[in-house]
């Protein structure tokens, strides 16, 4: 809410360095952190909003459903809005200063539609792929298995453990997706198991 209000107060202008520092302070006033440098936590929180698609790079705008998400009267509606926002706008390579047009969640779900299920190793493989290099918007099973094998060789999971866990957590929160026996499925497909 603080970030969205800040965007409104700045009339949807790109955030300046001093404004960004003030925004971090506002966040820490509401949600204090006891870390050595609490502003790191505030910056991570802001970047998470950008990566999930709630807020745009430069903190000059937000997703059309972000305020509705904050006002959602029920958890079910909030979960629905989360899925819509993340599905439409999530970009895990974006941050406050750098825009990145790739739509990772859309790429993952499009691949899942064609493969049926994704194990953690395959999800890790997908994390190493640039969706922009695949104009079809998905990859087939052979490409995915090759990417997974290469990620395994490069110790991607060990180096990116937190990011892998974060992505799996986000995917599990999306409407119509679920993990069953450590594999990602569409809910409808998982119910048939």
Where are these regions (language model features)?
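Donor-sugar nucleotide-binding helix/loop cap in glycosyltransferases
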Residues: 1-193
């Amino acid at each position: 809410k603080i970030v969205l209000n800040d965007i409104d107060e700045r009339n949807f202008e790109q955030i300046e360095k001093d404004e960004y520092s003030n925004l971090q302070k506002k966040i820490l006033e509401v949600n204090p952190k006891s870390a050595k440098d609490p502003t790191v936590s505030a910056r991570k929180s802001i970047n998470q909003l950008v990566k999930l698609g709630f807020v745009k790079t430069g903190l000059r705008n937000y997703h059309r459903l972000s305020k509705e998400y904050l006002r959602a009267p029920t958890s079910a509606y909030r979960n629905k809005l989360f899925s819509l926002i993340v599905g439409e706008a999530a970009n895990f390579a974006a941050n406050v200063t750098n825009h990145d047009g790739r739509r990772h969640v859309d790429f993952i779900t499009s691949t899942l539609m064609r493969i049926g299920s994704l194990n953690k190793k395959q999800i890790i493989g997908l994390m190493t792929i640039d969706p922009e290099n695949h104009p079809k918007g998905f990859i087939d099973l052979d490409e995915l298995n090759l990417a997974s094998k290469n990620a395994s060789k490069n110790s991607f999971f060990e180096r990116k453990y937190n990011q892998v866990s974060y992505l799996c957590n986000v995917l599990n929160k999306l409407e119509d997706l679920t993990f069953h026996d450590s594999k990602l499925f569409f809910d409808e497909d998982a119910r048939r198991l």
